[in-house]
Amino acid sequence: MLWVGTFGRGLLKLNLKGNDINRILLNDEIRYVNGIAQDADGYIWLVTEKDGIYKSIENKIFPNLRFSLWEKSNKNNHYCLHKDRNGGLWFGDNKENILWVNPTTGETVIHQLPPETADSAVTAAILKLYLNSQNHLWIATEKGIMVYNHQTHECIAAQPYTKEFKKITAICEDGDGTMWLGTEKGIHRANCKGKQIKFTGGYEKERNLTPGKVLALYLNNYNQLLISYTDKIIQIDGKEKTVS
């Protein structure tokens, strides 16, 4: 299934194995959707640019499905959203706060990165979150990238942005456990080396393509990473780590 937010204040749910398309018209007050997730109970969650977190009132999909502002969100905050492999929802905001939600039980846990464990060089408004198979939370901010152990509340590694490595726009893990970061300057492979994070780029140049802003990353069932740019889509083999 693929969820798409449109510029016409609507949602599309696409079944890539068939021809089914579900269209949902959003409430008038919902604009600039930053993330979409459907929980295990069928409810749809939306995060917005500056209108807070919304949850569908019903767990059935139909064109006039209504959404309400989630009671634990701040309407003035900018949020990002990540759904982990266990169905948990992770929300990051522009106030450096992280909120984990079990949508089935309603349990919530707030993570505030403490100064003594977080790296101040990268601590800033949160743009992207990703919980990997090692149960480490990758946090992309306006200043850089941090790997955080949410169980011990420790910063494992961190790296500020550089001239060659700019703002992170997407995060994904392949089937071998390798982390990939989409940025405003192309795709990069990431590896933790002690307290630092090392990046490997240049994948676009393997096919004589110009590195551009990555819009989205998607890993299919064949361990192939699909990378969407503003003007192209390329594929990286998750095993060989090469453009295929």
Per-region residue spans from a language model:
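Carboxylate-rich, polar loop motifs that coordinate divalent cations or form catalytic acidic clusters
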Residues: 1-244
